[in-house]
């Protein structure tokens, strides 16, 4: 599924609701990012769409994401990359105790066939540079 197909299937405005009550005469609206019908929703879907549109504009063929084991953005990017058949590398910074922790987002990243690269927090920059150079060689 291409980014265009994802965008055409998502109504990003459909999740704005007018509240029944008002505040001091003001009509209030809420945006339900969690109701976006892609990768369990959230504002990270909007961010990922922008990233993939930028990736497309620049003719890139690989995406790198960074975050912790519970990262919503990693989940959405890995899922979107899988749907578009784009190689995805997810750099996960580990803190003490993380090796015993696996979040739902972590599982979903792995199910999306993203290449997960674990590193210590102090090595994030070095790891990002290494993965970037590896992607540029392909």
Model-derived regions: residue spans:
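PLP-dependent amino-acid enzyme catalytic core
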Residues: 1-138
